[in-house]
Regions:
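Bacterial N-terminal signal peptides
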Residues: 6-16
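Zn2+-dependent peptidoglycan hydrolase active-site motif and core
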Residues: 89-91, 96-137, 163-164, 168
Length: 202
């Protein structure tokens, strides 16, 4: 066997190995990434107080009451105060009403002060957002939260009002999705009655 013939055979042998290796790599399937599961809001609770359930009335059943209801004076949310009145609720804990993801957490300016918005994925695939306004402090600015996890403290919108929590609940058709909005409007399409929704989804 001549040297040239031997060289050709060796070259052909390595070419076959490389070809088979390339085919194996081409046919090798990439692993399918595991999708990140969405956190589901399968139950709701009130955002203030020592218990998950509150009455809207100023009574002895709990320490809180709904001072301005949804729809009252074109109000787009609810204003929660302590029964003791004034600024006695300043610094009280504010909790997430359900499992969700924070999509907004910053000072929204005059009339709002600090605001947190949480997006909630419902079991049926729809979404709602809860808004917590006039906070004295924001304690969590991003990421997932669990139901009744503290996200802030009751405040007074940088001194503009007596301390209270302004709570809103919105559905996906809301024109103020991911935004603070105005707090009042004659048109309430896209906003939900917070207490009614919470009571229906405990």
């Amino acid at each position: 066997m001549s040297f040239i013939t031997f060289f050709v055979i060796i070259a052909f042998f390595f070419a076959q190995i490389n070809c088979n290796s390339s085919e194996a790599q081409t046919n090798k399937k990439e692993p399918t990434p595991t999708p990140t599961p969405k956190i589901i809001a399968d139950s709701f609770a009130y955002p203030i107080g020592k218990t998950e359930v509150l009455t809207e009335a100023k009574d002895k059943k709990d320490d809180w009451y709904n001072a301005q209801d949804f729809g009252e004076n074109n109000h787009l949310g609810e204003d929660w105060n302590k029964n003791s009145g004034g600024n006695t609720d300043c610094g009280e804990a504010v909790f997430a009403i359900a499992n969700g993801t924070i999509v907004y957490a910053e000072n929204a300016g005059i009339g709002w002060g600090n605001v947190v918005i949480i997006e909630h994925n419902l079991p049926d695939g729809t979404k709602v957002q809860s808004l917590y306004g006039h906070l004295q402090k924001i304690l969590k600015t991003s990421g997932e939260v669990k139901i009744r996890e503290q996200i802030g403290e009751v405040g007074n919108a940088d001194g503009r009002y007596f301390c209270h929590l302004h709570l809103e609940l919105r559905e996906e058709i809301c024109p103020m999705w991911n935004e603070a909005g105005g707090g009042y409007d004659t048109i309430r399409k896209g906003w939900l009655d917070p207490s009614k929704f919470i009571d229906e989804h405990r």
